[in-house]
Amino acid sequence: MADTDIRVAIVGAGGRMGRQLIQAIYQLDGVALGAALERSGSSLIGADAGELAGIGHNGVTVCDDLTSIVDDFDILIDFTRPEGTLTHLEICRQNGKAIVIGTTGFDEAGKQAIKQASADIPIVFAANFSVGVNLVLKLLEKAAKVMGEYSDIEIIEAHHRHKVDAPSGTALAMGESIAHALGRDLKACAVYAREGYTGERDPKSIGFATIRAGDIVGEHTAMFADIGERVEITHKASSRMTFANGAVKAALWLSGKNSGLFDMKDVLNLDLL
């Protein structure tokens, strides 16, 4: 580790995403693994984080107490569960540590807690850290402005059998991008399930369909369907490394900032498109 490297702590270091985040850290210059965390009672406590990630021994021991390692990192990356992330967020706020949040499934109170914490510390909070997905979000804004008023809009997403929230955070972000471009409130126009006799489709609605099966990493399609034609904008992820690399790049971008709430559009400068 060079003296100038940004030290990153990974929450859920022994999970699939955590291991790939550690791998991503070792593939990028200017960043180093400072600490690794797992839930209390995990059999991985005390293990070497580098060995867990398949990169060899690195001397970073997995622990279960974030407060005990606050001096070992500059930025925390958290892709876990909402309740745990909010606990870690408060510890970061109290200790002046930046945080990158990839956790999905927050309720409105959780989102508000993140916003409030950003007054004190810098936060990147995004539903998806893939460069491609965030480009898609920008493309959807443009497509909605051209076709959205006269097209039926549907969002279809597919993930692995272990994903616990639905629709995915990315699907909701796609819906928000479209709704915002059309001046609509997603909460009012979203349709999350159809069953039985539903009547005709509300032309102002944005529909969501969810698939959970096998080991699908993540697939999202937004459809703008008119009579005689439709446009589909699709993103398919084949590896979690695309999310891991994006999150670590977000951590590097966040370094040196004092406070504020940001997303991947800020990290990638997509508002310039």
UniProtKB/Swiss-Prot annotation:
Its main location: cytoplasm. It is an enzyme of class 1 (oxidoreductase). Keywords: Amino-acid biosynthesis, Cytoplasm, Diaminopimelate biosynthesis, Lysine biosynthesis, NAD, NADP, Oxidoreductase. InterPro entries: DapB_C, DapB_N, DapB_N_CS, DHDPR_bac, NAD(P)-bd_dom_sf. Its EC number is 1.17.1.8. Coiled coil: none annotated. (S)-2,3,4,5-tetrahydrodipicolinate binds at H160, G169, T170. One of its GO terms (cellular component) is cytosol. Pathway: Amino-acid biosynthesis; L-lysine biosynthesis via DAP pathway; (S)-tetrahydrodipicolinate from L-aspartate: step 4/4. One of its GO terms (molecular function) is NAD binding. One of its GO terms (biological process) is diaminopimelate biosynthetic process. Gene3D superfamilies: Dihydrodipicolinate Reductase, domain 2 (3.30.360.10), NAD(P)-binding Rossmann-like Domain (3.40.50.720). It is found in: Cytoplasm. The active site is at H159, K163. Pfam families: DapB_C (PF05173), DapB_N (PF01113). It comes from the Bacteria. It catalyses: (S)-2,3,4,5-tetrahydrodipicolinate + NAD(+) + H2O = (2S,4S)-4-hydroxy-2,3,4,5-tetrahydrodipicolinate + NADH + H(+); (S)-2,3,4,5-tetrahydrodipicolinate + NADP(+) + H2O = (2S,4S)-4-hydroxy-2,3,4,5-tetrahydrodipicolinate + NADPH + H(+). NADP(+) binds at R39. NAD(+) binds at G12, A13, G14, G15, R16, M17, E38, G102, T103, T104, A126, A127, N128, F129. Catalyzes the conversion of 4-hydroxy-tetrahydrodipicolinate (HTPA) to tetrahydrodipicolinate. Homotetramer. Belongs to the DapB family. PANTHER family: 4-HYDROXY-TETRAHYDRODIPICOLINATE REDUCTASE 1, CHLOROPLASTIC-RELATED (PTHR20836:SF0), DIHYDRODIPICOLINATE REDUCTASE (PTHR20836). This is 4-hydroxy-tetrahydrodipicolinate reductase. It comes from Photorhabdus laumondii subsp. laumondii (strain DSM 15139 / CIP 105565 / TT01). The lineage of its organism: Bacteria, Pseudomonadati, Pseudomonadota, Gammaproteobacteria, Enterobacterales. The gene is dapB.
